[in-house]
Amino acid sequence: MKIGITGSLASGKTTASKILSSGKGPLFSADRVVKELYSKNYFNKIIRKKFNIGTTKNIKKILKNKILKDRSNITKLERLIHPLVRKEMAKFLKKYKNKKLIFLEIPLLIESKLMKNFDVIFFLKSKKSLSLKRFILKGGNKELFNVFNNKQLKDEKKIKFCDHVVTNEKSIIVLKKNLLKILKRYE
C-alpha cells in the first residue's frame, strides 16, 4: 500500500512521515532528494547556468533572492527539480514494490497531480502563524514564506484529494497518537 504524506507549507510533514513510517515501512522524501541534488556538482552546474549564478558558494541563498525578485524563477526551478525527483520516486517504488506499506512524503503531491499513485493520502495542516514560525526556524523569512505559500494551492482545494486530514498544532506526542490511530486501519 502506497501512503502519501503532503500538507501545507511547514506543517510538520517530515515529522509526520517519520512517525508513520517508523518500523512500518520505507520512506521516500522529496525534500531529501532535493537536498541531495544540491550536494551534487552536476546539479549545481545546471542551476548556476540556468540562473546565471557565477559563484559556487551560497547557491541556495542566491536562488532565494532571485525568487524574491522574480516569482517566475520558482516555476523555472520546479521544471528542473521535479523530473529528477520523479525519477528517484520511480526507483524507490520499484525497489519496494513488494512491501506491505511504503510511505512517500511529497510536499507538492496535489499540485503535481500525483494523487492517482497513492492508495491513501494524509494531509498535514496547521495555523498559518505556526507554519510561518516553523519556516523561519528552518532559515526562511516571512517574505519567502508568502511567496512559496501563495504558489501552492489553498488547503481547502488540496484536502478534497486526501483521505485523512491531521491538524498539527500541539505536541509531537499528540501528533503521533493521532497519526498512529489512523495508520492502524491499514496495517
Predicted feature residues:
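Short, well-ordered beta-strand core segments
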Residues: 27, 102, 119-123, 165-166
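Post-Walker A helix-loop "phosphate-sensing" segment adjacent to the P-loop in P-loop NTPases
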Residues: 21-30
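The Walker A (P-loop) glycine that initiates the GxxxxGKT/S ATP-binding motif of P-loop NTPases
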Residues: 7, 19
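ATP-dependent small-molecule kinase phosphotransfer cores
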Residues: 32, 36-98
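Small-molecule kinase domains that catalyze NTP-dependent phosphoryl transfer to phosphate-bearing small molecules
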Residues: 89, 97, 116-117, 128, ...
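ATP-binding Walker
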Residues: 11
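Hydrophobic anchor at the beta1->P-loop junction of P-loop NTPases
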Residues: 3-5
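Walker A/P-loop
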Residues: 14
